Amino acid sequence: MTTRIAVVNAGSSSLKLQILDGSQEVAALTLERWSADAAPEELEEFIDTAGELEAVGHRVVHGGSVHSGPVVLDDAVVDYLESLTDLAPLHQPKAVAAIRALRALLPEVPQVACFDTAFHSTIPAANATYAVPWEWTQRWGLRRYGFHGLSHAYASRRGAELAKRDVADARIVTCHLGAGASLCAVRDGASVDTTMGFTPLEGLVMATRSGSVDPTRIASEHAGSS
């Protein structure tokens, strides 16, 4: 007997859901211009026709310093995820809104969050630590969290499979290239470095994000020099 689950990906502007029966997709829904204000009727109708679900899995961009792996969602976890909004303002509010909407629609179904930051929890301190006063690091929890982790984890496994290599004994660079973009160095199946950092703004040039900018450039602008 297969397990029927819902998989939820709340992006910055859209909400995507899949119903999986085992590994087989049986239904899908994409809501463009997804708003965090209220659950749209289409979502309720989709869930009503999804059949009996055994679990719901949510992709969440930021797990903070607390969550380095999947976690069952309860009120305390949801509140903590909401507190991370400033670190991922385009994505975190939409993910939290989707979680709350699905928990309201399916109060008896266990729901789990899987984090884009979790894959990067293996980055060694030498690569994850910023060259700033240690007091800042401790006070604000500064570290290279990294993002797109679910994508990088899959790409590394799939890339190794296609190359007929064991991912646990391979060195791979993975690329997530969309409106947001990042690279990741994967060694023996674990993330050891990535281009994104404390927030999803750092690293490569992206569609609406500048990527890394020399901080002196900002100072010179304020000083009237260009």
Predicted segments with their positions:
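Short beta-strand-loop/turn "lid" adjacent to the catalytic site in phosphate-handling enzymes
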Residues: 48-95, 109-112, 118-130
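Short glycine-aspartate micro-motif
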Residues: 4-8, 55-57, 112, 172-176
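ATP-binding/phosphotransfer module of carbohydrate and carboxylate kinases, centering on a glycine-rich
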Residues: 222-226
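A gly/proline- and charged-residue-enriched helix-loop-helix capping module
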Residues: 80-98, 139-153
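Short glycine-rich, Thr/Ser-proximal phosphate-binding strand/loop in the N-terminal lobe
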Residues: 4-38, 197
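Non-transmembrane, aqueous-exposed alpha-helical and coiled segments at domain scale
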Residues: 3-4, 93-97, 106-108, 182
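Conserved active-site "lid/cap" helical segment
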Residues: 32-54, 84, 98-100
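Glycine-rich phosphate-binding loop of actin/hexokinase-like ATP-binding domains
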Residues: 122-221
